[in-house]
Amino acid sequence: MSSVYADVIVDITNEKLDRTFQYKVPPELTGEISPGTAVQIPFGNGNRTITGYVLSVGNEPKYPQDRMKAILAVQKDAATVETKLIALAAWMRHTYGSTMIQALKTVLPVKVKARGKETREIALLADPARCEELLENYRKKNYKARIRLLNALLAQPVLPGPVVSKKLKITADTLHVMEEQGVLEIRRTSTWRNPVSDAAGRTTAGKPNEQQQAVVDGIRKEWEGQNRPCLIRGVTGSGKTLVYMELMEQVLSEGKQVIVLIPEIALTYQNVERFCAQFGTRVTVVNSRMTPSERADQMERARRGEVSIMIGPRSALFAPFPDLGLIVIDEEHETSYKSEVTPRYHARETAVRRAGLEHAHVVMGSATPSVDASYACETGAYALFRMDARYGNVALPSVWIADMREELQMGNRSILSGKLREEIEKRLEKKEQVVLFLNRRGYAGFVSCRACGHVMKCPHCDVSLTAHNNGKLVCHYCGYETPQVHACPSCGSPYIGGFCAGTQQIEQNVKKLFPKARVLRMDGDTTKTKNSYEEILSSFAAGEADILIGTQMIVKGHDFPNVTLVGALAADLSLNAVDYRAGERTFQLLTQAVGRAGRGEKPGMAVIQTYHPEHYSIQTAAEQDYGAFYEKEMDYRRLMGYPPAAELLAIHGAGEDEAHLTQAMEYIRRYLIRIRGNREVQIIGPASEAVSKINDLYRMAVYVRAPQEEVLAGLREKLERYIEINKGFRTVYLQFDFSRKY
């Protein structure tokens, strides 16, 4: 028998160790080791025992055998990486700039091996004649426990484990001896926890209407042809979920499996229940509220083929299905699909890659697709399908834009405009419900004038300046600074500063204005406990409250038929976030918020309160006109050179010593200027991050902008080598983050 060797990646995150090391596979472990297996290996000069993951197995040694170490053992309690996911991890490592072990741990959704709940049965093997001989022998030697068990098995040849251990008082040692003698066998089976109950029964979602069927047929035709990723752009309430389910039925009928990605914030009972009602216990769910062992159980059920549909947030993308057929990405525009830890992968890009590796399909849906996804449709990389009418031809809500500058001029300094207050009173009289949405997304201390709406912005980057405690206004892209202002430079008004109102303050004001109204608040403070999120939504859905106040979590895919009014408070907060995507985020949030109104039989209305009523993000959200928004946003991106009009690489640095970090990031800037070559490559920064310190680590960034991704990839590789040989970076933690075209 020829020798077997394994290429192993060590479980140490270090650029210098980011390669495979070859080990001998001992003969006794040959049958247990395959690509993806976690193993114990001796490593380094001291041969300390560490964990590694096998990437490949072969019969060709790369080094002399007398120099090669051997694998010590298979790590029994560790999860195994599926072979298909190893290839995906290799792509992520190259694409997003990480070590292979970081990429492997990302595609390994759970770090521990699933154990399940083991059930045991004791079955009799010996025939009656031999049993008589054994009983006679046991009596002579006074083996009371064996006599008791054998008599019980003669009466009932298969006994449940608990009966044997608890009722008959039989020890594990006795069972082991009798099993060794061939008298009986211990049958062990594992069952896995199932978070989805079939007790409520199955229902069908109904037949697609003409608009939905046209999209289903169009996507099926695309699958038969180019099989490009498909994007469904459907207005809020158009019935995209039913389209997903029709396509899922086809894939399941072919014996394949489906992954459905839903943002964590929208992963509610109401959303998941529709899939469970249609597909029953073929569905399983994972989410962050589960324990690691609960998530491990669901991944094991997927690997064994016990379930066919995995629903979950970003991490569900790595479900180890044996024959994946379809990946659905609901609310494709959601920012939570982008990882904030290395590797900083995007679920959309990674889903497209996984589908390509496994010959599966990708279908995405959103009322407000990301600009990146729409650009991919424009270039022909994705196929676009539109759903412009609500299901059942329900009318879109009417929208009123309240100019808060005019409210101030009329003496109204309340958080609620006169129009919104008037409409709330009408809804309360008619026993209808109201949602008040505080748009705090991306708020990081921007400064604006309440009289004219002027916002202090960077003259170089067109992003909002951030107020700091040292009296400075700072740009977190390029580092530009200017002194804090006490009067508006545009109109001279003293009413200039940051926006301080939070959901708690709004709740207090609303209760004062409407003392008889039943008010619920939903934010980070009220949803800390495990089930509080569902309890608040269920209470509101049941009509136990008249007004629901909250942040972005209340506008994510919830369906409340009795909600006829939505108030979007302070729409400008996300518009002035320190991010070139601020306009896109604002349009998406406002469109989603407006879409919560009038989803039942009663007509809906939305009031958008803003200091910038003329901004295209506000105007197009009010008109629910995605096409107009996309055109104007792309004009802005092209003018400023932001993705998807260009490629952007962010180099994030963190360190305990602020001066040392600043020096290191300046070294990076100078080195990039020296090697960039192409004049079209722009180096921006270094500058402090929007949140400049977290957990005692100072944070800074340098940005590199270029027309092609290949240019940035080449610069990153050179920079990585420069950092590796330069001792000045040893106390600085660096991350690379690409913002691609699609």
What positions do the PLM features span?
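Short, intrinsically disordered low-complexity segments
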Residues: 38, 59, 682-710
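A carboxyl-terminal module marker
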Residues: 670, 674-676, 680-698, 719, ...
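Short glycine-enriched loop/turn motifs at secondary-structure junctions
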Residues: 17, 72-73, 645-646, 696-698
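Inter-lobe coupling/hinge segments of SF2-like helicase ATPases
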Residues: 203-209, 213, 217, 226-662, ...
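A general secondary-structure junction signal
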Residues: 56-58, 108, 188-190, 438-440, ...
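A short, contiguous, amphipathic alpha-helix enriched in charged residues
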Residues: 5, 34-35, 660-673
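Accessory, non-ATPase domains that flank or precede helicase/AAA+ motor cores in DNA-metabolism machines
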Residues: 1-366, 378-394, 675-678, 703, ...
